[in-house]
A protein has these predicted regions:
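Class I SAM-dependent methyltransferase SAM-binding "motif I" and its flanking Rossmann-like core
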Residues: 17, 91-164
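Class I S-adenosyl-L-methionine
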Residues: 1-115, 223, 262
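A contiguous loop/helix-start segment that scaffolds small-molecule binding in enzyme catalytic cores
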Residues: 163-271
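A generic local secondary-structure boundary/capping motif
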Residues: 1, 70, 115, 130-131, ...
Length: 271
């Protein structure tokens, strides 16, 4: 190991548009010597990595890129492992810590590498912002990818979210090899929700290829051409309604307050 202490940053680059990347994420990427990531994610920061050592990986090579990032940091390099959205939500930081735990990494040891998760704007944040206010009350997040989690476990989680009347954000709704999962999920929700429950389908949020559809649960499958790994689906709950093409999930103020007042009873303090 180098005498210089290496640093490993697991960086969330957000939905893909630099306007929605955090200042710290940009700063860390710019000061890093080595950039590692899935090829599509690396391409999102192409203009920030000129002249750097860059390693691009294909999908399903997560373990390889995580190990390489750790290896470079252990050699004293400053490394950014880039992840779309937020690295702590279906991202790479969990795998990094799993590997480090197996290696016996001690974060308090001054000779150990420095590791930091740099948060980013997740799909659930970016997609919700594009379609109104769908996440105002309790919500659940479920990934349809059964590559690492058995489908029967995913079904149990979907059932629990549907039965609990949670607004539900669905990541990875479909791929070339996964076509039945969202159809099955829709059937589960229809057991507990009305067919006209609002849903949103957002593909490529804040990217040039962005597509948005706000529709209803019973018509979800009419938009299967939008489904893929960069698509997020938001399923409303029993309170969600559609207004002007937006999903609105009431926070509960209507039951406690008069929302439109003829005259404000108490004036705010002016500073």
């Amino acid at each position: 190991m180098s005498s210089r202490k290496g640093k490993l940053y697991v960086v969330g680059v957000g939905p893909g548009n630099h306007d929605h990347m955090t200042y710290r994420a940009k700063m860390i990427i710019e000061k890093s010597e080595v950039i590692i990531g899935y090829d599509t994610y690396v391409s999102l920061v192409e203009d920030l990595i000129t002249g750097k050592e860059v390693y691009r990986y294909a999908m399903t090579q997560e373990v390889d890129r995580a190990n390489q990032a750790i290896d470079f940091a252990e050699k004293g390099r400053i490394v950014s492992l880039v992840s779309s959205g937020d690295p702590g939500i279906y991202g790479m930081v969990g795998l990094i810590y799993e590997i480090l735990a197996q290696k016996g990494w001690n974060r308090e040891d001054s000779s150990s590498i420095y590791v930091e998760c740099v948060p980013g704007v997740s799909s659930l944040n970016s997609c919700a912002a594009l379609v109104g206010s769908p996440l105002m009350t309790d919500f659940a997040v479920v990934s349809m990818s059964d590559l690492l989690v058995p489908w029967d476990i995913i079904v149990k989680r979907v059932e629990a979210a549907a039965m609990g009347d949670y607004v539900t954000v669905i990541y990875n709704p479909a791929s070339k090899k996964r076509v039945h999962q969202l159809r099955d999920t829709r059937e589960i929700f229809l057991k507990y929700r009305k067919p006209d429950t609002p849903i949103a389908i957002v593909k490529g949020a804040y990217r040039e290829s962005q597509e948005i559809v706000v529709t209803t649960l019973d018509k979800m499958l009419e938009h299967q051409d939008m489904l893929g790994m960069i698509t997020t689906v938001i399923v409303g709950n029993s309170s969600t309604f559609n207004y002007e093409g937006m999903m609105i999930n009431p926070r509960g103020y209507t039951s406690k307050y008069e929302l439109i007042k003829q005259q404000q009873q108490q004036q705010p303090t002016k500073q």
